[in-house]
Swiss-Prot record:
Record-stated family: Belongs to the Glu/Leu/Phe/Val dehydrogenases family.
PROSITE patterns documented for this protein: GLFV_DEHYDROGENASE (PS00074)
GO-annotated molecular function: glutamate dehydrogenase (NAD+) activity; glutamate dehydrogenase (NADP+) activity
One Gene Ontology cellular component: cytoplasm
Protein name, UniProt field: Glutamate dehydrogenase
Key words of the record: Chromosome, Cytoplasm, NAD, NADP, Oxidoreductase
Swiss-Prot/TrEMBL catalytic activity: L-glutamate + NAD(+) + H2O = 2-oxoglutarate + NH4(+) + NADH + H(+); L-glutamate + NADP(+) + H2O = 2-oxoglutarate + NH4(+) + NADPH + H(+)
CDD domains cross-referenced by the UniProt entry: NAD_bind_1_Glu_DH (cd01076)
Species annotation: Thermococcus kodakarensis (strain ATCC BAA-918 / JCM 12380 / KOD1)
GO BP annotations listed: glutamate catabolic process
Binding site for NAD(+): G220, Y221, G222, N223, A224, G225, Y226
Compartments where located: Cytoplasm; Chromosome
NCBIfam families in alphabetical order: GdhA_Arch
PANTHER family: GLUTAMATE DEHYDROGENASE, GLUTAMATE DEHYDROGENASE 1, MITOCHONDRIAL
């Protein structure tokens, strides 16, 4: 099977969306290209005294709506094409929830599991020394991503402050930091909570009174999967009947044990499998369960043309990135299943990162309750913007999300005089 280039895929998705909107060819050509691509050498002194030089990237896709925003990935198979694609997709994600940002993304080709903690810190600081002049609170705001975390963000922020010789904190340069250095507590469950709000609104769109007693199956039990289980069962009264991880899943039609118990079992046994009071199922079986809502929250490409016709859920909430293939999209649409596309469904994380940045810039911090209320408002409006476009144009929810997002970026470009039409 020939693997498609990630950036080529991003361009093709943009071209598909353009069919459903009035956008000029010159604007479309501009949106197909990142506005800035930076490739840097990142030298690191290793613990044995030797020096290794790693390759790093920072891509800023479009800043028509504001500073670019996006995570920094550390991965041995990182490529410039992947970073360009992710920066492009980030532009649409921040636009669909109407954040005043453009899309950015960074990466380093490295296997962080082979580095000591001190080597990781030196890598983080060296990367910032290489890109400090293209990032900043009003320019480009990084965040955690694959194999990076709040601790690494704090090192990066500290290095940026040191280089810029600021007389005070530069908290706003990076989000996803620990609470003690400008981070916010509400970030932990933000992706799952944002997804929960879109699920609630999707239920309303289908005419359901509420979610109490409705069933949901969640594929994936990382941060997003665990918190989604916890929020949907404890706050929305849903019956979580199945969850899974990479080794398999568990099922109970009457509802699983509480999320904290499932997480405890997973930590002690390395998987959710074999938990008392449940029956083991495969990840494939989970996707085809008779449930009201299916939430693929693990990896991409799990719902394909081979199994899409067997999906029985009425709502598919794409908490993971790209869990449904384009061919499967068509099948789910024909079956009348309401999809919440990934870059809308999982935008809660970047939305709360935006809230962190706003609070850093203003030096005034909200309560967790206030942060969650603002997240609810953002995700609710975004869902209905997309759903109404889906109905008005009679197009797929994913296409509708692209139309909403691309239109907002296009409008900003016209206002700036970058394009005439």
């Amino acid at each position: 099977m020939v693997e498609i280039d990630p950036f080529e895929m991003a361009v093709q998705q943009l071209e598909r969306a353009a069919q459903f909107m009035d956008i000029s060819e010159e604007a479309l050509e501009w949106l197909k290209r990142p506005m800035r691509i930076v490739e840097v050498s990142v030298p690191v002194e290793m613990d044995d005294g030797s020096v290794k030089v790693f390759t790093g990237f920072r891509v800023q896709h479009n800043w028509a709506r504001g500073p670019t925003k996006g995570g920094i990935r550390w991965h041995p198979a990182e490529t410039l094409s992947t970073v360009k694609a992710l920066a492009t997709w980030m532009t649409w994600k921040v636009a669909v929830v109407d954040l005043p940002y453009g899309g950015g993304k960074g990466g380093i080709i490295v296997d962080p599991k082979k580095l000591s903690e001190r080597e990781q810190e030196r890598l983080a600081r060296s990367y910032i020394r290489a890109v400090y002049d293209v990032i900043g609170p009003w320019t480009d705001i990084p965040a955690p991503d694959v194999y990076t975390n709040p601790k690494i963000m704090a090192w990066m922020m500290d290095e940026y402050e040191t280089i810029m010789r600021r007389k005070g904190p530069a908290f706003g340069v990076i989000t996803g930091k620990p609470p003690g250095v400008g981070g916010i507590v509400a970030r932990m469950d933000a992706t799952a909570r944002g997804a929960a709000f879109t699920i609630r609104e999707a239920a309303k769109a289908l005419g359901w009174d509420d979610l109490k007693g409705k069933t949901i199956a969640i594929q994936g039990y990382g941060n997003a999967g665990y918190y989604l289980h916890k929020i949907m069962s404890e706050e929305f009264g849903m019956k979580v009947v199945a969850v899974s991880d990479s080794k398999g899943g568990i099922y109970n039609p009457d509802g699983l044990p509480p999320a904290d118990e499932v997480l405890k079992w997973k930590k002690e046994h390395g998987s959710v499998k074999d938990m008392p009071g449940t029956q083991n199922i495969t990840n494939e079986e989970l996707l085809e369960l008779e449930v009201d809502i299916l939430a693929p929250s693990a990896i991409e490409g799990v719902i394909t043309k081979e199994n899409a016709d067997n999906v029985k859920a009425k709502i598919v909430a794409e908490v993971a990135n790209g869990p449904v293939t384009p061919e499967a999209d068509e099948i789910l649409h024909e079956k009348g299943i309401l999809q919440i596309p990934d870059f809308l469904c999982n935008a809660g994380g970047v939305t709360v990162s935006y809230f962190e940045w706003v609070q850093n810039i203003n030096g005034f911090y909200w309560t967790v309750e206030e942060t969650r209320k603002r997240l609810d408002d953002k995700m609710t409006k975004a869902f209905w913007d997309v759903f109404n476009t889906h109905k008005e144009k009679n197009i797929h929810m994913r296409d509708a999300a692209y139309v909403v997002a691309v239109s907002r970026v296009y409008e900003a470009m016209k206002h700036r005089g970058w394009v005439k039409k």
